[in-house]
Amino acid sequence: MPARTGKQYILGLRESAAEVFIHGEKVEDVTTHPGLRNGVDTLAGLYDMQYNSAIQGEMTYTSPDSGEQVGMSFITPRTADDLHNRRIMMTHWARASCGMMGRTPDFMNVTIMAMAAAGDYFAQNRPEFKDNIQNYFKYIRENRSEERRVGKECRSRW
């Protein structure tokens, strides 16, 4: 997704609130609930690191499609430098969370990036699957998660 700030992350949680229950009680706002707010604040801090001018070049890179800054976790490592740069970004996030956050926001980016890089594998039985996964990868890299959410009218059908 285009790099976003912690404030954008928190706003997205509030605008597209999921139904969350703790001990049988509905949580009205995950961003302020005492059992969840510290995790939300930690994730927001990680997103803010993408805009920290001292390390922004280590946290983001320029998208080859949109020219926007996107998270380094989306980079498809084609060189040793690419892999090194991605490790630096992940190290920043691991240190910021003291290594205690097992699923930082980049884990799914890396998964989809790897699938897109293996497009030929997906094309073995159905050639269009290569285009599908590569187009999906570009879509999630270029669009913030709150812009990708399924509308409430559609969610009710699932």
Could you describe each region identified by the protein language model?
Residues 1-63:
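Acidic/polar, glycine-rich intrinsically disordered N-terminal extensions of enzymes
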Residues 48-146:
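Internal helix-loop-helix
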